[in-house]
Amino acid sequence: MAEAAAAPISPWTMAATIQAMERKIESQAARLLSLEGRTGMAEKKLADCEKTAVEFGNQLEGKWAVLGTLLQEYGLLQRRLENVENLLRNRNFWILRLPPGSKGEAPKEWGKLDEWQKELYKHVMRGNYETLVSLDYAISKPEVLSQIEQGKEPCSWRRAGPKVPDVPVDPSPGSGPPVPAPDLLMQIKQEGELQLQEQQALGVEAWAAGQPDIGEEPWGLSQLDSGAGDVSTDAASGVHANFSTTIPPTSWQADLPPHHPSSACSDGTLKLSTAASTEADVKIVIKTEVQEEEVVATPVHPTDLEAHGTLFGPGQATRFFPSPVQEGAWESQGSSFPSQDPVLGLREPARPERDLGDPTPTVPQDETSPGDWLFGGVRWGWNFRCKPPAGLNPRTGPEGLPFSSSDNGEAVLDPGQAPRPFNDPCKYPGRTKGFGHKPGLKKHPAAPPGGRPFTCATCGKSFQLQVSLSAHQRSCGGQPDGVPGAAGSARDGSGLRCGECGRCFTRPAHLIRHRMLHTGERPFPCTECEKRFTERSKLIDHYRTHTGVRPFTCTVCGKSFIRKDHLRKHQRNHAAGAKPARGQPLPPLPAVPPDPFKSPAAKGPLAPTDLVTDWTCGLSVLGPTDGGDL
């Protein structure tokens, strides 16, 4: 036995035993870590439970407080109900007669009271209010009492209003305002119908007897006084003075049936109905006619006609507005109209005369101008909002003769002499460019007969305008010809000249970019590599080589590009019929691609987004998120 116990243990056995112990220790450590994690989670849940319990306790306390308040109010209501029941059961109630002011109305002579009288009245009203509240009388605090306590004067407009008689109501238990009794409503309705019939029968006879026959001819300028432009109003009655001869005052001061206002006839003029309205309605009609008279007395500039073209129809202004030929106001179009808005009455400075140099055609005296002169064409009298009459050419006029220009004899419509129908742009003789307004036409000269008369003495390049030649000479190194004081001035480009090579520039940014070539400065470094660039746009294009973003995609073959000019070059290859890249079949192209600008009828009206898409040929815009310029 001793020999067996003293036998040495082999090292392999020891190693196996140690490894087994290590594995056991590791498993125990893992269990310990898991227990620690579970303990932490349990502690966290316990803390959350405690927090929730505290919040629930706070909410419960608030609920208990609200419940206690409700119980107290319920006890008060129950006691008041018991008191009312005892009074009704014992018939121990009385009628309380209160002095004036108990219902919250202020005395009529409040402004004549002294301070001590007002203070006494305030105390009396407060005592009455407290007495009513102590007797369980459901009443709110009077508004007049609140105003008096705040030191304000009681509102007098409430006292001046008509008194509304008390109407018996049905004590319906449902919610909502009290509703008058049905029998009273029927009685009021029947009495109102009878009174209305009597007033109509009497009022029509009185009105027809005292008024002239105005149904045949509407109120026009012929029925007004000669001083149509002078507006005079009676301060007492508010009636226009010019209508004293047309409408006798005694005719409309009689009792007239109500609810019959003046009506507008189909021809655009105002007529009074036979069953006319009350005195206030007649005054309204007269004021309306005065406003129209003011419109007649004020001339309107032709450029302001389009804004007011919808007030009357094509033939409805003849009765209100005189013909300019008949009144002698048909002057040459070179004179400026005093611009005043007929509706708002806003005056603008007089427009200057035309300075285009073309002759101003005048209208012959035998040419009759149509009636709708104000809201139609200044020369021919048709409405701008509607189509011109049959046989009238908006480009030629009523006689069929176009207005000729002194430059080349081309028949055009002078935009300064008549408003432009259908939003046509102004065009100058010999030029294809159109302008939407007259100032742009003035700034754009006619095409010179020589083509390009302005030639640079340094390089021999020709230009159409002297301004273009001056800008070119600043970059070419020469001086503008024919400009007084050009040498040594600030416009000769001496301030934008490079000191290294002597080159001139028209903009400071171009000079700064040029100087970077001499100094070697590259202020835009790449954060991914060591390259630097002189322009931010080039740095953005370089970033796309790192990110792999190709925002410009060809709509024909689907190929993407980093730069926009690469896409344009690729699209030019498609347009020229070049073969596609290897492995990329080219889909069939349409024989004639539609042009939305030249053939809008083939494609229909385009939205602004469609026009932008067709114009850019599917180019996508590079935004700030993709690295584009802001």
Curated annotation (Swiss-Prot):
One of its GO terms (cellular component) is cytoplasm. Residues 434-445 have a biased composition (Basic residues). GO terms for biological process: negative regulation of DNA-templated transcription; protein heterooligomerization; protein homooligomerization. There is a cross-link at K283, K287 (Glycyl lysine isopeptide (Lys-Gly) (interchain with G-Cter in SUMO2)). InterPro entries: KRAB, KRAB_dom_sf, Znf_C2H2_sf, Znf_C2H2_type. SUPFAM superfamilies: beta-beta-alpha zinc fingers, KRAB domain (Kruppel-associated box). Residues 348-357 have a biased composition (Basic and acidic residues). Residues 155-177, 326-372, 408-449, 568-605 are annotated as: Disordered. A zinc finger (C2H2-type) spans 454-476, 496-518, 524-546, 552-575. Residues 16-92 form a coiled coil. PANTHER family: CHROMATIN-LINKED ADAPTOR FOR MSL PROTEINS, ISOFORM B, ZINC FINGER PROTEIN. This is Zinc finger protein 746. It comes from Bos taurus (Bovine). The gene is ZNF746.
